[in-house]
Amino acid sequence: PGAWTVSSILALGLGTLVVLHIALVQRDFSRQLAADLPKNAPTAFLLDVQPDQWSGVAALLAAEGATRVDSVPVVTARLTAIDGTDTATLAARAKGDPRRQRWALTREQRLTYLATLPPDNRVVEGALWSDPSAAEVSLEKEFAERIGARVGSLLDFDVQGVPLRLRVTSLRTVDWRTFGINFFLVVEPGVLEKAPQLRLAAARLPKEREGRVQ
């Protein structure tokens, strides 16, 4: 019984230390995250806004004192082939290649279309919207590496039943630390406007108003 009591006390003490350590790590992480966030970082994100709802949502955000509102269209699609090779074959090959990631090939993709890139994006290879003979897409650089694409690659998509071929004309780096709205795939204007789509929005709200909008 004495030994059991000692063991119980030790276990309780160790458990308390572990919980305390986790709490301290969480607190330090939260402080670091808060310190790293830009002062104008969004504090609220609105997902799956219907296009015909957006004007009302924008008015609500303005009424709640939003000082920054960003909104972009979102089109879902499936990547079906890269340079003529179907993604099922590419995913099978990716099993033995540490540079490739199968999820990037097989998951549902979310595309947006923009005339200009957000300020936290930087083109590092190729040029944005530089090929008038093709429908163009700009890829985030690490995503391009994961799927095995490069400048000049042809990407085939199934956009909710409609086939679409896009040429990669630029690669970008993205500063994800800004918490801005960013995408792996950005398509040039004039290609996806008629596709079924939703809107994604990010806003910076006064702290006391965040709960009301969410």
Give each language-model segment a name.
Residues 1-214:
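Alpha-helical transmembrane segments of bacterial inner-membrane membrane proteins
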